[in-house]
Amino acid sequence: MKQDPRFPNLSILNHPLIQHKLTHMRDKDTSTRTFRELLREITLLMGYEITRNLPLTSRHIDTPMGPMEAPVIAGRKLAVVPVLRAGVGMSDGLVELIPSARIGHIGVYRDDQHRPVEYLVRLPDLEDRTFILCDPMVATGYSAVHAVDVMKKRGVPDENILFLALVAAPEGVEVFQKAHPGVKLFVASLDSHLDENAYIIPGLGDAGDRLFGTKN
């Protein structure tokens, strides 16, 4: 995991397996089926990285050989909240890693001005819960900012929100950081820039279309 001095709340997950899988996802010749499988796999690996600092406590259990005090995640419950539609492909890997996690959904699309339009919010109970929001791309940053706005307006504090993405543009990370400097953002890659159509360069194309096999 490495940092970028420009963006204090950004962590880049540079594990070799994550980078290897991301390269295959970027390849335009990767099939929809393979892209979907890679998205699940890379999200599982990224989930392992971002949860490494969850606090632990101990619980008394009995093993086949006798009693012991064993570590378990302390206090906070976990929830996975994909940003529709492409975020759904990331939730599978996270739930595989954390089977007890609750699942919510935030539906957002970008209008002609690349501004977020909300059409759905479904969340589990918020009390004493850490939320992992996921969306493959942070391009302009507006959808990510809006998704975090949804959580904070409902009283979820910054420290209980983690945002997970595969690829981000510096422009989007800057927007996100200005809006939510206390929310941690985790990505597999910070790419070069946005083009005139607000696509990430070099990016991986439209993640939703590649995941579902649709045309934009």
Curated annotation (Swiss-Prot):
It is an enzyme of class 2 (transferase). This is Uracil phosphoribosyltransferase. Its cofactor is Mg(2+). Allosterically activated by GTP. It catalyses: UMP + diphosphate = 5-phospho-alpha-D-ribose 1-diphosphate + uracil. NCBIfam families: PRK00129.1, upp. Keywords: Allosteric enzyme, Glycosyltransferase, GTP-binding, Magnesium, Nucleotide-binding, Transferase. It comes from Ralstonia pickettii (strain 12J). Belongs to the UPRTase family.
